[in-house]
């Protein structure tokens, strides 16, 4: 047992980068208030905190559940076209997401399996959204790279 624990600790050190923290958010919420608080504001605040400590925070967000709607640029050609509250806020959401992707290097990974299930075409997504075969694979991959898991749900 001690050998297994020692091996796991050594593997953790292999993935750890000096001064770099890593987090993967498991984003499933469709609640706009929660999304804005935890993703749009929360990630910026967390990045600023670690920058103030002269440390880097790498962030990945795995998108599935009810969260697809926040990452679609063409709502008129999506299952969310009748969500008037979302349509009204979509421009602000897109600008803030683009800032997170571009200026803060946040990686957004969307579940392809759920996209197919919800009839969401890749061409309707923002260009900074990457596709992962499914949410579980995206989460496993990031956790295998040393990312800490945090869920964001309703």
Predicted features along the sequence, with ranges:
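Secreted/extracellular ectodomain signature
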Residues: 17-154
């Amino acid at each position: 047992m001690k050998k297994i624990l020692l091996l796991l600790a050594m593997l953790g050190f292999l993935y750890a980068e000096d001064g770099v923290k890593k987090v993967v958010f498991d984003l499933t919420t469709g609640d706009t208030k929660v999304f804005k608080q935890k993703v749009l504001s929360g990630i910026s605040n967390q990045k600023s905190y670690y920058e103030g400590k002269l440390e880097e925070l790498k962030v990945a967000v795995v998108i599935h559940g009810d969260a697809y709607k926040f990452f679609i640029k063409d709502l008129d050609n999506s299952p969310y076209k009748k969500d008037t509250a979302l349509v009204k806020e979509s421009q602000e959401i897109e600008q803030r997401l683009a800032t997170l992707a571009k200026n803060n290097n946040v990686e957004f990974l969307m579940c392809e399996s759920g996209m197919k299930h919800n009839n969401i075409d890749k061409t309707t997504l923002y260009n900074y959204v990457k596709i992962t075969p499914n949410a579980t694979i995206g989460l496993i991959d990031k956790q295998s790279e040393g990312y800490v898991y945090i869920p964001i749900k309703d």
